[in-house]
Structure formats: C-alpha cells, structure tokens
Regions:
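Nucleotide-activated donor-binding/catalytic signature segment of Leloir-type glycosyltransferases, i.e.
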Residues: 270-307
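A conserved catalytic-core segment of Leloir-type glycosyltransferases
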Residues: 3-65, 189-190, 194-202, 207-208
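Conserved donor-binding/catalytic core segment of Leloir-type glycosyltransferases
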Residues: 234-249
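Catalytic binding pocket for nucleotide-activated donors in carbohydrate/polymer assembly enzymes
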Residues: 307-310, 314-391
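Conserved nucleotide-sugar donor-interacting segment of glycosyltransferase catalytic cores
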Residues: 48-125, 136-140, 179
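Conserved small/polar residues in nucleotide/adenosyl-binding loops
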Residues: 1-5, 393-401
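Donor nucleotide-sugar binding/catalytic pocket of nucleotide-sugar-dependent glycosyltransferases
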Residues: 110, 120-227, 231-233
Length: 404
C-alpha cells in the first residue's frame, strides 16, 4: 500500500508494510529516501526532516489503513511533531476528531533541536507555531518541546525523574515547561522482559539457577567468566560488573577518580560497553595495570551482558542522572546486587539495604561524590564477606531478587 505525502515544498512517496506477529498488527512506514541504509539515525539535520516526514506520514496513513486509534503514543523527539500536526491540521478532519496523544520522554537531554527557519520550511507549519510558548526555544526549533506542549498527556519513565525534570539541574532548559505541564505529567517506571532475562532458562549464561539453587549454582558463572576473561579464577573474589554506554551521564567520572581504590586485591571489576574515547581508554589503562582484576571489554555483546549479570556479585550504576535505567532491573533478576546513585529510576527501583531491619534489594548513595560511592561499595563488600546471613546474599534473597 502506498500514497503521496506533501512535505513543505516537495511530495514524497509513502509506503506501508504490514506484519502480524503474535496476534498484533504492526505497520511500517516505507521510504527509501529517508529510511534507506543500515542505521536508524544519521546527522541531526537529516533526521529533523526524516522524522517530520515520518510524523506526517504516520498520521496520513491512518484513514487509508482504516485504523482509527483512541490514543497515539509518541516517544521522544523523533515523534514530537505528531501531537503538533494532530492538533494543527489533522484534527479538522472528521476521522481524527477525538484522537488523543501521549508524549513519553525517555531522556530529556535529547530534544531534536535545529535552525528555526529551516524547520519552518521542512514542516510547513505556520509562523504562530514557532513562538516561545510552542516550538521555539532559545531561537531554535525544538521537536520535543512541541510534543510536550501539544500532547494531551506527558509521561516519563520513573516517578522520581518526573519530579527531577521540573528542576533546573535536570530540566535541560525545559524545566519551566515541565512545571507548567505538571498537571498532565506522570512517571511510569520501565520494566524488562522476564522471559528474556531468566537465569533458570537463559541459554546465554554458563550455568542456570533459580531461587532454590541460587546459593549452590550462581558462583559457577563467576568462575566461568573469570576463565573466559583471563581473570584470577577464585570464587571468593568480590566481582563488580558495569554494563553501560561509556558517557558522562553514567557517572564514570566518579569511577575514574577512585578506580585505584576500587581495584583492591579482593575485588574484580568487569566492564562491558562503548562510548566516549576518554572512558574507553581509562578502562583499557586499568585493564593493563590490574590485568588479573580488571577486564575492560570495549564493545557490546548481548551474550556477554547476560554473562556479566549472572556472574557478578554486585552491579555498579553511579549515574549523574538516570531517567529509569534497565541494567539494575536485569542485575536484580539474576540475583546480582545493584549499587546505585539515588537518582531517577534507580531511586525508584532499588531499595537500599537497612542492616537494622534486614530489608533492601541493593545499596545506594545520594550525592554525586566519588568517595561517597567508594564508601558504599566498600560497605557492600563488607556485607558480602562478613554478614552472609543478611538478606542480600542468601537464598532467601533470591525470592526478592530473581523473582522481582
């Protein structure tokens, strides 16, 4: 199925592919000019036009398909124009009347910002849409801002992040707008696929285990990973994992500041991920310096990530900010205790251990401070070695951790 779509001064082909999978029908917008190639994203100036086309094409295709949704759920700046187009143009048609939109923000840092004059030309929107209370922001056009302004509801991926983005520190220059739209803003925490991340059936890990066999079987994954990565093979080592994009958002400046102290003789540190060159080289350096304790795997592998979740004793996420985070949920699923900074979804999903009440699913620290992080890592290590009867490292914990 195909049609033609006007985009400012040009007319573009719109193809629609249909797939039914597990009883759900999926529609895909096709256009080789915009979507040819092997990467979903390109340069920002190209993506600005690509996603303007996509937003308009998706709305235009609905009556052709005979599919009238009650709600259109938009995700991030790439679909930020859908609520704008829906109210500016499409809602005038009988077919579209009553359709509502929801705008979900996964990370407020990414907003789809480009030159205002060029965006006017690309989108075909009239001048009145490019004012400071609509799409204009600091003399540029901002797709995400448009979506937030025009959507009927706005959500983000955790309750704490929904509150944080109303403040200047986390608000990415949109905190005033988030406060203004707070009456329609909600935080809904992310989740993971419990079938995909299941230590009892996961074919990617070395040794399967469940709530009952947790104590007897999990450590075998540690020894197997030590062997594969060339680390000292010793089940008594306290193994910390870090699977992440290597960017400043992830709190890696804290790790860099105290890495020598983290690499104590009884600790092993396994890193998996790619990102900024300075962090990649930092971890490579410590891999060279402590080659029996540190393994820097500067690539990404789904198979290896599962092995790290299953093998480690603790999982480190000291993020500067974290809208939700999924890795802490994955580590919990494998009975690997998260050590996190209390921000965004990390605060919402990890209950800090209370030694007096014997409750908690992980360890946390509040301030963005390297020595505060180091202190909580050492506390987690002390609990691991000297308080084996505590909730976190017993098979009783498996009911809370693996059975999240």
């Amino acid at each position: 199925m195909y049609k033609r779509q006007d985009l400012a001064w040009r007319t573009q082909y719109v193809g629609v592919f249909e797939l039914e999978w597990n009883g759900v029908t999926f529609y895909f917008i096709d256009n080789e000019f915009y979507f040819g190639g092997n990467k979903p994203y390109s340069w920002i100036h190209e993506d600005i036009e690509k996603f303007a086309f996509f937003s308009k094409a998706a709305l235009s295709a609905l009556p052709v398909l005979g599919f009238r949704p009650d709600i259109i759920h938009c995700n991030d700046w790439q679909t930020g124009l859908i609520p704008v187009y829906l109210k500016e143009r499409f809602s005038q048609g009988e077919f579209y009347q009553g359709i509502k939109s929801i705008m979900t923000i996964h990370n407020l840092k990414f907003q789809g910002i480009w030159d205002l004059k060029k965006v006017k030309d690309i989108t075909g929107l009239p001048d009145e849409y490019f004012t400071s209370d609509k799409l204009e922001a600091y003399d540029d056009a901002n797709y995400l801002k448009g979506g937030i302004v025009y959507a009927d509801r706005v959500t983000t991926v955790s309750e704490t992040y929904a509150e944080e983005i109303k403040t200047p520190f986390y608000g990415e220059n949109l905190d005033g707008l988030m406060r203004a739209r707070s009456n329609v803003l909600s935080g809904i925490v992310n989740g993971i696929d419990y079938d995909e991340y299941n230590p009892e059936t996961d074919k990617r890990i070395y040794n399967n285990y469940n709530q009952v066999t947790f104590r007897k079987e999990k450590w075998k994954n540690k020894v197997a990973l030590q062997k594969e990565l060339g680390l000292t093979e010793d089940k008594g080592k306290f193994m910390i994992g870090l699977v992440s994009r290597l960017t400043d958002q992830k709190g890696l400046d804290l790790v860099a500041y105290v890495m020598d102290q983290l690499c104590a003789e009884d600790v092993q540190f396994v890193v998996l991920g790619t990102g900024e060159e300075r962090y990649e080289n930092m971890f490579r350096h410590y891999d060279w310096k402590y080659n029996d304790r540190v393994s820097a795997n500067i690539y990404y592998s789904e198979d290896m990530s599962h092995k790290v979740y299953a093998a480690c004793d603790a999982f480190l996420m000291p993020s500067l900010f974290e809208p939700c985070g999924l890795s802490q949920l994955m580590s919990l699923r494998y009975g690997t205790v998260p050590i996190v900074r209390e921000t965004g979804g990390l605060k919402d999903t990890v209950e800090p251990y209370n030694e007096y009440e014997g409750k908690g699913t992980g360890f946390s620290f509040a301030n963005y401070n390297a020595h505060e992080m180091l202190g909580i890592v050492n506390y987690a290590k002390d609990v691991y070695y000297n308080h084996k009867s505590c909730l976190l490292y017993t098979s009783d914990a498996a009911d809370d951790l693996i059975g999240v």
